[in-house]
Amino acid sequence: MSLWRRLTGRGELPDGFTGRLEGFERVLASAATSDGHLVITSLGLWVPVAGGYRRIGWHLISNARWDGRALHVTEADEAGTAGEAVLLTDRPASRYPLPAPGHVPQLVHGRVVRSVEASERREVPGGSALFIRRRVPGRDGVQVQVRPDPGTGLDAVRQALG
């Protein structure tokens, strides 16, 4: 382990990484992709995008799956609120081929799983939804999130939550 990592608690950033880390954000690992690197930090997963990098908070990753060659990440968008709950909609999964993945797939999966305190599927008018209590990196407490199941509209969830 390098002296820098021992002193700061931060892993080293890969060459060419242009994201801006928070002062308390720790680098845990990284792996090269065809478009740059995936960088795993205490606050989320940094992914390459046109012109740089962006961080996906652990609380906004609905699913992370490793198929032996690539990491598939399903990111959620915040689509509003209903009472105290944050409504989520999933984006199509993004695929990140990792020729030398190291521990990245396990770290990502573990971080996503540990962000979930509890979850349960509930019936709502016109369908069902997944209710999730999640820890948000860098914040105290938990956030209640609701992800409608396919075919269940956001309005049905809003109505159910009053």
Locate the predicted segments by residue:
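Eukaryotic intrinsically disordered, low-complexity regulatory linkers and tails enriched in Ser/Thr/Pro
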Residues: 1-162
